[in-house]
Swiss-Prot record:
<keyword id="KW-0687">Ribonucleoprotein</keyword>
<keyword id="KW-0689">Ribosomal protein</keyword>
<dbReference type="InterPro" id="IPR008991">
    <property type="entry name" value="Translation_prot_SH3-like_sf"/>
</dbReference>
<dbReference type="Pfam" id="PF01245">
    <property type="entry name" value="Ribosomal_L19"/>
</dbReference>
<dbReference type="InterPro" id="IPR038657">
    <property type="entry name" value="Ribosomal_bL19_sf"/>
</dbReference>
<dbReference type="InterPro" id="IPR018257">
    <property type="entry name" value="Ribosomal_bL19_CS"/>
</dbReference>
<comment type="function">
    <text>This protein is located at the 30S-50S ribosomal subunit interface and may play a role in the structure and function of the aminoacyl-tRNA binding site.</text>
</comment>
<dbReference type="GO" id="GO:0006412">
    <property type="term" value="P:translation"/>
</dbReference>
<protein>
    <recommendedName>
        <fullName>Large ribosomal subunit protein bL19</fullName>
    </recommendedName>
</protein>
<dbReference type="GO" id="GO:0022625">
    <property type="term" value="C:cytosolic large ribosomal subunit"/>
</dbReference>
<dbReference type="GO" id="GO:0003735">
    <property type="term" value="F:structural constituent of ribosome"/>
</dbReference>
<comment type="similarity">
    <text>Belongs to the bacterial ribosomal protein bL19 family.</text>
</comment>
<dbReference type="InterPro" id="IPR001857">
    <property type="entry name" value="Ribosomal_bL19"/>
</dbReference>
Amino acid sequence: MQDIIRQIEAEQLRKDIPDFKPGDTVKVHVKVVEGNRERIQLFEGIVIKRRGGGLSETFTVRRVSYGVAVERTFLVHSPRLDKIEVVRRGRVRRAKLYYLRDLSGKAARIRDKR
């Protein structure tokens, strides 16, 4: 039974996901349905966490827009995601960057990976 479930899940995993980690700046292209039409919405920000594995793996992206911080969580293998672009690689020493929530402005910057 477990083998059947694993096999079905393996078929649904996406292969076009780039390698990204917490601290990286990413652009997430999300398919949004409004009424009867579908469009692609862009969400760019810093990955503050990545958790889970397999089909249930998620990542959270944080961005500050006009002084308001917005965090959005996405399923990595969701069909709603059109694509994920890595804009910048960041150098951090933590897996979960919750401390960024308390920082603002230049203090919230993350160093570039060399």
